[in-house]
A protein has these predicted regions:
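Glycine-rich phosphate-binding loop of ATP-dependent small-molecule kinases
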Residues: 1-490
Length: 490
């Protein structure tokens, strides 16, 4: 893109000022429409050091009510961020509906720096490019406006700006070794930048090259492009998104009705196995921490199937400093106002730690689907988005273990009645549980489709036969141990 880029002609000063005034006014009006329509806008500023990203950003945000936007400067990842997936620190920054988020440098800057300084090779570069493309596409598919600007200046212009900044003691601090290094290796940087821009350019979120030699002209290009992009997004906000074909390897899994639930353990067998398996898991937890391998354990299942007791037998073997259990309920207002995966990105473990989810992102294709909390296009799209999310975790190095806790309808009824008739257990049963029970067949259809479409080789499902809770608990412990041992043996 940069190598074939034709520099636009700068308008005369009078025209420039007129267009600046018009664009600033228009953006001020559009911010209210963004709020009214609930349009989330993510704006990424990338480019050469000293190209003026910060100063243009400062000019642009003067036209927006500060209650409706945030600005984040993405420096080098912190130690904590390095222990999370590559995209973690960007996904958690996405704006809520009706808000704008400006990023002064972002995922492009991180990737190209790693390439330029030989921190990643070709294979890792391609993997990160795929991650970026999936990330950006998921945002735009879910109604986000993503606008990406690259500020372009010549080698000569950059060198001149570096020298001017260095001459003034009050601005000298703004020049780091990065700018000098870029200028010295300008051609190499140009090639890497150009390749990245080409690799991540798409019709849904294209790159806009900003001629940044003149500051006012750069501001005008950004403002007019923002205005045009926002107006288009507001007009097209209700268009359905085409469904993508799944490209991830799937394994066959039986339907729930085909699974026998008569498996059980005696109390004596259960106690013996529980003690041995918990001791084994405790040892493995220490090894996980030393090897810095993250683990994500996801629980789904019927109400009263025994998820809580199952989780308790796993956590009973773990160092409390190295795990966290996340009970997932209906999304809070700030969670509902963002991409549905946002609240799960926020709860990911750091390397060496374990995150256990009691209910998960699969709510999108179960309760949200059946209760009408999302459109058919949205839940149909979610299968692929979830596979992508889990692929991101797998590529990061996470062990992903997914459990469906299965019981039959009669067993559920017996447990519901026991809860209703036992004072200390009454808090466990709600009217919603009874309503969901009435939709058993609909839920079973949805669960079977979920299992079929998301049973990937890197994040397979495990069905726990839980008519006998003791059997299910022991089976879960064995599966967790086997998965962790396999990861440690790699």
């Amino acid at each position: 893109m940069l190598e074939n880029w034709i520099k636009p002609q700068i308008p005369e000063e009078e025209e420039l000022e007129e267009r600046l005034h018009a664009a600033r006014s228009k953006l001020s009006v559009l911010q209210m429409q963004i709020k009214e329509h609930g349009l989330p806008v993510l704006v990424l500023f990338e480019g050469w050091g000293t190209a003026g990203k910060g100063s243009v950003l400062g000019k642009v945000i003067k036209n927006i009510d500060p209650r409706f936007f945030k600005v984040a400067t993405m420096d080098e990842p912190t130690e904590e961020e390095r222990r999370k997936p590559f995209l973690y620190r960007y996904f958690v920054k996405i704006p809520a509906n009706g808000k704008l988020e400006f990023l002064d440098s972002g995922w492009m800057d991180e990737v190209v720096k790693d390439v330029l300084h030989d921190k990643i090779g070709e294979k890792e570069y391609k993997k990160k490019i795929e991650s970026v493309k999936r990330f950006e596409r998921q945002l735009t598919d879910n109604g986000y406006l993503v606008m990406k600007f690259f500020f372009q200046i010549s080698r000569k212009e950059q060198k001149k700006r570096i020298e001017v900044l260095k001459e003034n003691k009050d601005t000298r601090w703004r020049v780091s070794g990065d700018e000098d290094w870029q200028n010295k290796h300008y051609d190499k940087c140009m090639h890497v930048f150009d390749r990245y821009l080409n690799d991540t350019n798409s019709p849904a979120d294209p790159w806009y090259i900003v001629d940044a030699k003149n500051r006012k002209w750069a501001e005008l290009q950004v403002l007019e492009t923002l205005v045009s992009g926002i107006e288009t997004a507001l007009k097209n906000s209700n268009l359905a998104v085409p469904l993508l074909q799944n490209v991830f390897p799937l394994e066959k899994i039986p339907k729930l009705s085909e699974i026998s639930l008569d498996k059980e353990l005696s109390e004596e067998e259960y106690k013996k196995e529980l003690k041995n398996l918990q001791s084994k898991l405790s040892e493995l937890h220490n090894k996980l921490y030393r090897r810095k391998i993250p683990v994500v354990i996801a629980y789904e299942g019927w109400d009263a199937a025994g998820k809580g007791g199952n989780i308790k037998r796993i956590t009973g073997a773990l160092d409390p400093r190295g795990f966290e259990v996340h009970p997932i309920a209906s999304p809070l207002p700030n969670e509902k106002a963002r991409h549905y995966l946002w609240r799960f990105w926020n709860r990911l473990p750091k390397t060496g730690h374990i995150a256990i989810f009691d209910r998960t992102w699969y709510g999108r294709v179960m309760v949200e689907r059946l209760e009408g909390f999302c459109s058919e296009n949205e839940w149909q799209r979610a299968y692929n988005e979830i596979n992508e999310f889990e692929k991101e975790l797998s590529d990061w190095g996470a062990v992903i273990i997914k459990f469906w806790v299965q019981i039959d309808k009669d067993t559920q009824l017996a447990r519901f009645e026991e809860r209703r008739n036992t004072p200390e257990k009454q808090w466990k049963i709600t009217d919603e549980d009874w309503r969901n029970r009435e939709k058993w067949d609909l839920y079973e259809t949805a669960v079977n489709e979920m299992l079929k479409k998301t049973n990937t080789t890197y994040a397979p499902w495990h069905v726990l036969e839980s008519n006998d809770k003791k059997y299910a608990r022991i089976k879960a412990l064995k599966i967790v141990i086997d998965a962790i041992e396999a990861a440690l043996d790699k």
